[in-house]
From Swiss-Prot:
Lineage of origin: Eukaryota, Metazoa, Chordata, Craniata, Vertebrata
Protein name per Swiss-Prot or TrEMBL: Inositol hexakisphosphate kinase 1
Keyword vocabulary terms for this entry: ATP-binding, Cytoplasm, Kinase, Nucleotide-binding, Nucleus, Phosphoprotein, Transferase
Function: Converts inositol hexakisphosphate (InsP6) to diphosphoinositol pentakisphosphate (InsP7/PP-InsP5). Converts 1,3,4,5,6-pentakisphosphate (InsP5) to PP-InsP4.
Highest taxon above the source species: Eukaryota
Bridged cysteine pairs (disulfide): none
Amino acid sequence: MCVCQTMEVGQYGKNASRAGDRGVLLEPFIHQVGGHSSMMRYDDHTVCKPLISREQRFYESLPPEMKEFTPEYKGVVSVCFEGDSDGYINLVAYPYVESETVEQDDTTEREQPRRKHSRRSLHRSGSGSDHKEEKASLSLETSESSQEAKSPKVELHSHSEVPFQMLDGNSGLSSEKISHNPWSLRCHKQQLSRMRSESKDRKLYKFLLLENVVHHFKYPCVLDLKMGTRQHGDDASAEKAARQMRKCEQSTSATLGVRVCGMQVYQLDTGHYLCRNKYYGRGLSIEGFRNALYQYLHNGLDLRRDLFEPILSKLRGLKAVLERQASYRFYSSSLLVIYDGKECRAESCLDRRSEMRLKHLDMVLPEVASSCGPSTSPSNTSPEAGPSSQPKVDVRMIDFAHSTFKGFRDDPTVHDGPDRGYVFGLENLISIMEQMRDENQ
């Protein structure tokens, strides 16, 4: 069974940033744009999420050629929580200890033996220098609904100095500017509420440790895409399957094999992140999806034309890999597309200046030079060394709680060929981006 070693949780109080020699105080992952489980920041290079056994086994069984397109799996931790006298909750991660008797529902599963993961040190691996925008200590109280009003207060130990603004349904900016992606905060509150409701029976929770795929980026622009024409797993109840099929039929999942599940994009003109959530994505038409993709690639001043080829190259590479994965199905899986919002190449700045001159807006040129100039210098967090290199982009598959393949966990349903629904979504995403590139050359 899982045990917490040494110290009690909560004894460090609401202002704790570390939880002793063994425990690590978890913080909400401020760049979560989609999903329903709360992602937590473990250290600069690692995030964690509530463990789902099927997803854990899937990460352990990944084909080698898929690993380029998925977060690195780093193991498991035990997570404890306890409210202090002021009503704040601390989530603390400890080494996961596996004994001979494991209190799990899946102990009888027959599959490939689990890899034995060394219990990694739970000290922070960095001081936060990779994310200079993160500051310490922000307190928020849950008060958005009667449900949340009863929840304990949430202590957020890190936040971004770059504000996040949610776009409402009419494409207007919300008035609220906060230091976390709104979806991240929502998921965190819901996760704490669920854990608190179960606390009478269970004090320990297993979390997966995964690579923080945005840690290379200073101002990560993230697009979360729900991929495929089908979202329900083979083991879904008839009710859930029907519900998921309706969502697909009423969205671009049916027509394109992909829909927007969330996004954040950094705006150079305002210095804010603009955010969209899954409800926005579900209501998009095909043209609306195109517009959302355009908005994701626009920094408030220009369309980032320099991103087309690097992203397309990644997407084509992923498509080629998945076409070789016979029997694999990635139901309800998402695809993250990531780039750095503060990166501005010299040629892009020159293009912008030329356009400005043609429009006789020479007075604006000093501002453009100012906004583009500083970011052409090497960044401590960006691997890009100069203006001649391609911008850093990344494409990663996430969320494998409903994935399957032949021989996996003795799943009774075995599928033939690759995941055609997922590949269909990639084909359409590639086609739309190619059209957008050609129209904006």
